[in-house]
From Swiss-Prot:
CDD domains: GDC-P (cd00613). Belongs to the GcvP family. N-terminal subunit subfamily. It comes from Lysinibacillus sphaericus (strain C3-41). Pfam families: GDC-P (PF02347). The glycine cleavage system is composed of four proteins: P, T, L and H. In this organism, the P 'protein' is a heterodimer of two subunits. It comes from the Bacteria. This is Probable glycine dehydrogenase (decarboxylating) subunit 1. Disulfide bonds: none annotated. It catalyses: N(6)-[(R)-lipoyl]-L-lysyl-[glycine-cleavage complex H protein] + glycine + H(+) = N(6)-[(R)-S(8)-aminomethyldihydrolipoyl]-L-lysyl-[glycine-cleavage complex H protein] + CO2. The keyword DNA repair does not apply.
Length: 448
């Protein structure tokens, strides 16, 4: 009989059944007990025309409070940045948009070169010796860094600063659980890693110390001090970083980082309700053969022409699974391309200007909140974000803000017991003086 959900004719079905030697479709399911088989039809709406379906989906999408129709001050790892128009044009080209793993370099030079350029730009921004072709996102990149450190040092403890993104820390803990690796949190003091606590916690079983730069609260930490303490204990120093900030801050590679990871979402990748994004992973040369994921290398073919190939693949799952340094055997090539196009379009000066604007506008917001009577929790150098104390539940304040067309900040109380009624406000280069003033005024009214 003709199947309700399969677009094949009865003749198609008959031919297929004949080939496999059964007389009916029902015969294929004889091993499934009759009493557990679904009877009847699913309650699915009748089919619609394409125009009617588009109208319905558009109406559903219109219920979303997006950053096109609203002013966003929400960050916490995913930011509303400027995306050069050329980004979507380039990544929508069919040779990139539909490309798969470039196992055949002779027909994949375009994709391989694009990945190579991404690796080069990330290595330059982070000040590291080399970078891989990308990771799934910043969280998985950080977790892979922790596992690399544990494998390299053959130690079973990782110290993670409390100022690292809470969700990133959760991903690290999930990876560590399966490897029987102990995760110890270094408390924060005044919004930065507590150095005294770090010195007490670190020992000769510590594989790595993980810090964030700038950290989750927007504070620019003195990561060189943290790195020195890690290296004194012969531990690796892992830095999770915002690559946009590295357009103006000293890169982690020059401050002692052994591994630098992060998320390239800030360059040409939409918020997209949290993903997909593009993690990056950069290391010093001594760790080159233990980097997870793919590496693209530049070489010369038999005729002396420059070419690009996947290289050092013995690190990957191409070898025996238990011998691989990581079971991540893919990458976010399309999103890495988006980040590469954005970085290229902006150029060094553009990235520096973009970073400078983020600092300046964050400082303006801090001053505006303090002038309005709010307390900004942590002082010191900020990038992108500040922590503001309120008198009321942050979620209730955010409900009031969205009615005014403003997407409020991240409620820190859900991750930090000591920061109940504190909100993480993100200010990017897209925000104007008028928008910042409106946020402060509306929060002031709701805060009273």
């Amino acid at each position: 009989m003709k199947h309700r959900y399969l677009p094949m004719t009865e003749q198609d079905q008959k031919e297929m059944l004949d080939v496999i030697g059964v007389s009916s479709v029902d015969e294929l399911f004889e091993d499934i007990p009759e009493k557990v088989r679904f009877k009847g039809l699913y309650d699915i709406k009748a089919a619609k025309s394409e125009s009617a379906l588009l109208k319905e989906l558009t109406a559903l999408a219109a219920k979303n409070k997006d950053t096109n129709a609203n002013v966003s001050f929400l960050g916490a790892g995913v930011y509303n940045h400027y995306k050069p128009v050329i980004v979507d044009h380039v990544i929508s080209r069919s040779e990139f948009y539909t490309a798969y793993t470039p196992y055949q370099p002779e027909i994949s030079q375009g994709e391989l070169q694009a990945i190579f350029e991404f690796q080069t730009m990330i290595a330059e921004l982070t000040g590291m010796d080399l970078a891989n072709s990308s990771m799934y996102d910043g969280g998985t990149a950080l977790a892979e860094a922790g596992m690399l450190a544990a494998g390299h040092t053959r130690r079973k403890k990782i110290l993670v600063s409390e100022t690292v993104h809470p969700e990133y820390r959760d991903v690290v803990a999930t990876y560590a659980y399966g490897q029987s690796i102990e995760i110890v949190t270094i408390p924060h003091k005044d919004g930065v890693t507590d150095i005294a606590a770090l010195k007490e916690l670190i020992d000769d079983n510590t594989a790595a110390v993980i810090a964030q730069y700038p950290n989750f609260f927007g504070q620019v930490e003195d990561i060189q001090v943290i790195g020195d303490i890690a290296h004194e204990a012969k531990s690796l120093f892992v830095v999770s970083s915002n690559p946009l900030a590295l357009g103006i801050l000293t890169p982690p590679g020059k401050l002692g980082a052994d591994i630098c990871v992060g998320d390239a979402q800030v360059f040409g990748i939409s918020e997209a309700f949290g993903g997909p994004h593009c993690g990056f992973f950069a290391v010093t040369t001594k760790l080159m053969r233990k980097v997870p994921g793919r590496l693209v290398g530049e070489t010369v073919d038999g005729e002396g022409r420059r070419g690009y190939v996947l290289t050092l693949q013995a690190r990957e799952q191409h070898i025996r699974r238990d011998k691989a340094t990581s079971n991540i055997c893919s990458n976010q090539a399309l999103l890495a391309l988006a980040a590469s196009v954005a970085m290229t379009a902006l150029g060094k000066q553009g990235i520096r200007e973009m970073a400078t604007q983020n600092i300046a506008k964050t400082r303006y917001a801090k001053n505006a909140f303090e002038a309005a009577g709010f307390t900004v929790a942590f002082q010191g150098a900020h990038f992108n974000e500040i922590v503001v104390k309120t008198n009321k539940c942050v979620k209730e304040i955010n409900k009031g803000l969205i009615e005014k067309g403003i997407i409020g900040g991240y409620p820190l109380g859900q991750n930090y017991d000591s920061l109940k009624h504190h909100v993480l406000i993100a200010v990017t280069e897209l925000r104007t003086k008028e928008e910042i003033d409106a946020l402060v005024a509306e929060m002031g009214a709701l805060h009273a």
